[in-house]
Swiss-Prot record:
It is found in: Host nucleus; Host cytoplasm. HAMAP family: INFV_NS1 (MF_04066). This is Non-structural protein 1. It holds the Pfam family Flu_NS1. Inhibits post-transcriptional processing of cellular pre-mRNA, by binding and inhibiting two cellular proteins that are required for the 3'-end processing of cellular pre-mRNAs: the 30 kDa cleavage and polyadenylation specificity factor/CPSF4 and the poly(A)-binding protein 2/PABPN1. In turn, unprocessed 3' end pre-mRNAs accumulate in the host nucleus and are no longer exported to the cytoplasm. Cellular protein synthesis is thereby shut off very early after virus infection. Residues 180-215 are annotated as: CPSF4-binding. One of its GO terms (molecular function) is RNA binding. Upon interferon induction, ISGylated via host HERC5; this results in the impairment of NS1 interaction with RNA targets due to its inability to form homodimers and to interact with host EIF2AK2/PKR. It comes from Influenza A virus (strain A/Mallard/New York/6874/1978 H3N2). InterPro entries: NS1, NS1A, NS1A_effect_dom-like_sf, uS15_NS1_RNA-bd_sf.
Amino acid sequence: MDSNTVSSFQVDCFLWHVRKQFADQELGDAPVRDRLRRDQKSLRGRGSTLGLDIETATRAGKQIVERILEEESDEALKMTIASVPASRYLTDMTLEEMSRDWFMLMPKQKRAGSLCIRMDQAIMDKNIILKANFSVIFDRLETLILLRAFTEEGAIVGEISPLPSLPGHTDEDVKNAIGVLIGGLEWNDNTVRVSETLQRFAWRSSNEGGRPPLPPKQKRKMARTIESEV
């Protein structure tokens, strides 16, 4: 096993522990608590994949961070912070919408890279909107936290979420996954639109109906994908 992979996991475990202590003192806002929950699932998946105990890794991560801080001067720390671009956290969904359990009458699940796509194929002739919580850097989608498809009545009928055991994805991965989800929902004559926030940072453009401008090649690929799986 690569030593950098292990040390990265150890540091991530310790930093999660620090953020958890911060939130437990009621100093964190909703995005902080949301990320804690999502990152906890990711760490559990990584720990299982690597065969490492999270508590032991957290202690080792603390030692690594303490050693770095001892060697780092205040001036170097200021320069590092100034040189790192800051990401923003954007929310279409409330905490309740993100944490709500939902059920599928005709479940369909597909993996697209490190993203898991789930949808209820029993849903027909509905108006559906896609909402997402994600981070943005340089005015582009950086990391998807969670995307869900809602009917006008507020029912959840689809979802895209990162796989805890496969961290890391690009904005193109997210757009491709959204294309698959839209294709699956539209197959049953549902009308799907994407939230303005998601359109702006994932595609930087959209049509008036809230439908992202998918290229013809991707449309054909989506149709073939859904047709082969139904």
